[in-house]
Design a protein with these regions (language model features):
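Residue-level signal for well-ordered alpha-helical scaffold segments within enzymatic catalytic domains
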Residues: 50-53, 72, 76, 100, ...
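Short, flexible loop segments at boundaries between secondary-structure elements
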Residues: 86-106
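Conserved non-catalytic scaffold segment of RNase H-like nuclease domains
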Residues: 1-65
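Amphipathic alpha-helical interface surfaces
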Residues: 40-51, 70-73, 77, 94
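Substrate-recognition/cap helix-loop segment adjacent to the acidic, metal-dependent catalytic center
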Residues: 52-55, 68-89
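Short, contiguous clusters of charged residues that form electrostatic/catalytic patches at enzyme active sites
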Residues: 45-49, 96, 120-127
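Short, surface-exposed amphipathic charged segments that create phosphate/polyanion-binding patches used
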Residues: 18-20, 102-110
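Acidic, Mg2+-coordinating catalytic module of metal-dependent nucleases/exonucleases
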Residues: 58-68, 72-73, 106-144
Length: 144
């Protein structure tokens, strides 16, 4: 999977904001999740370029836990930096919607890795999507 830790300064330089609620939320998380504050940082622009390179082409399907938060913020960051968004808007998917489909609500997998680490959360969500798909459509579970 793809993971980068982005500097706060590079976000603030483009007038991106950090809410007080978000800071309070982070202070309430476990030590393992807070380790993100001690990682080597990249600029937002570098992270966006590397994500584009990792995605590779615009046929990529992008998922997030909510259609109106992560993907729009990421798309806005691309626009601010003058970088083309590496996915087409019609290839955006919502994990929250998928996990609440009829017949899927009881399918919950245990957390994988560090709770609230972006890569761990993404991996767990991808595993859950595969399990839901297998349950709803009778297919063998795909591996992520």
């Amino acid at each position: 999977g793809f993971y980068r830790s982005i500097s706060v300064e590079s976000n603030l330089a483009y007038k991106r904001r950090i809410s007080e609620d978000t800071l309070i939320w982070w202070f309430k998380q476990g030590v393992s999740a807070q380790a993100v504050f001690h990682e080597n940082k990249e600029t937002l622009e570098t992270g966006l370029q590397e994500l584009s390179d990792w995605i590779g082409n615009d046929k990529f399907t992008i998922w997030s836990n909510g259609a109106d938060f992560d993907i729009p913020m990421l798309a806005h960051a691309y626009t601010q930096h003058g970088i083309e968004t590496p996915w087409k808007f019609w290839n955006s998917r919502c994990y929250r919607t998928y996990k609440n489909l009829p017949g899927a609500k009881d399918i919950r997998l245990p957390a994988i890795g560090v709770k609230h680490n972006a890569l761990s959360d993404a991996y767990q969500q991808a595993q859950t999507v595969c399990a839901i798909h297998a349950e709803l459509f009778g297919k063998k579970k795909a591996k992520v």
